[in-house]
Amino acid sequence: RLATAIDKNASKRLELQKIFVWIGRAKHISISDYCDVVVGLDKKSNALHYASLLFLVAAIVFTCVINPVIGIWLSIITYYKFKAGVDRYFICVNHIVKLLMGAGKITALNVDFLEEYNIKLKNITEDLSDIMKRSWLLETGNVDGSIMEMALDYLRMLTHADLIKFNNLIKLFHDKEKRIYELIDTLGFIESSIAIASFRNMLDAWCIPEFKNDSDMQLEVRNVY
């Protein structure tokens, strides 16, 4: 039904396709698989990350007595040690954030034949709004080379802010697991319906199969290849 409605509205289909292109895809990983892992992670203590901050502050405050390089060096070394273990999960969080933003773009279009899904997406994005609020410092590999991005990168290395935020996000992911999968399923259904509508437009003819509970089953097709 949704594919048929999309098929009849070429302009809306194009607008929706642009949003899904903007969302993109996560290369080399399955977001749903990583979501399974993320929600199953145990929340780790941030004690070491806060300790690194204290070392850095102490090195700066007592710069006349202690070489500040020691505090900076310790912060960076411990940062990369822990970052290597969770980097792939950062990508997962970032993609979920993009899905949430994409859901917002779709509902903003106010497409009439998506009314049922718009209501669902609005409820989901409201429930998952904390994920967007808490994930802004997470670096995901999409570095654009800007001065702002470079400054944030140094901030992350020195303060471990992204690692601290990620540890705090783990519990939120666990609590909102059902809603996260509802988001993935709903957007996936809309995108698959767009794909069906687009494929139909490529064909000279197509049909919708009719299933019957008949004891005398027969299959008859023509011009099939």
Tell me what each language-model feature is.
Residues 1-225:
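Alpha-helical coupling/stalk and coiled-coil linker elements that connect catalytic or binding modules
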